[in-house]
Amino acid sequence: MRTPFSLPLALLLLTPLAHAKEYPIGEPQLCPGLEVGAVYLQPIEMAPAGMMRATADSDVHLEADIRATADNRQGFQEGSFVPYLNVSFSLKKHGSDPELKGDFHAMVANDGPHYGDNVKLLGPGKYQLTFTVLPPSGHGSLGRHTDKETGVAPWFERCELHYEFIYAGIGKKGGY
């Protein structure tokens, strides 16, 4: 007798295998109303083309996973992605003078929305990572209700977060 096999069940069981291996950078940290996690993984192909550094010219895809906390005063539910933030990074390798800097782009992957960019590092070693998070700004951004009935609190001014990690390389793309 044949055992019935469920294709949806098989796909559900294989889904975790489709994720790239992420390397956490320290513990998530807090900005006012936000939790910010830092991770890296192998460089990522993106659409539209040209949005980020090419994978062939990059060592890692650096991400800031930014979610609302329970005490978020800007109207976001706990755990939800917060869009339209201005997120930048700087990386400094211990014992090296150059500082790598860049701006993150909002993007979405199979594990959800985040801010990120492909980055060329200065080789293996210990790195100091700084995220600078600024609130939405300008007309092309996220409007905020300010009336007494439906308004939300003003945005935070600026938030800087500091992480340290050791980069020893990553596995070959597709080898995860």
Can you describe what each PLM-predicted range is?
Residues 103-137:
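Short, solvent-exposed, Trp/other aromatic-anchored flexible loops in extracytoplasmic proteins
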Residues 21-56:
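Short, compositionally biased P/S/T/A/G/V-rich stretches that sit at domain boundaries
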Residues 62-79:
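Short amphipathic, basic-aromatic surface patches that mediate peripheral association
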Residues 134-146:
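Short acidic/polar inter-strand loop motif in beta-rich domains
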Residues 15-17:
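N-terminal signal peptide c-region/cleavage motif recognized by signal peptidases
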Residues 56-58, 76-87:
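Short coil-to-beta strand junction motifs in C2/discoidin
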Residues 95-103:
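Surface-exposed loop/edge segments in extracytoplasmic proteins
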Residues 2-10:
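Sec-dependent signal peptide recognition
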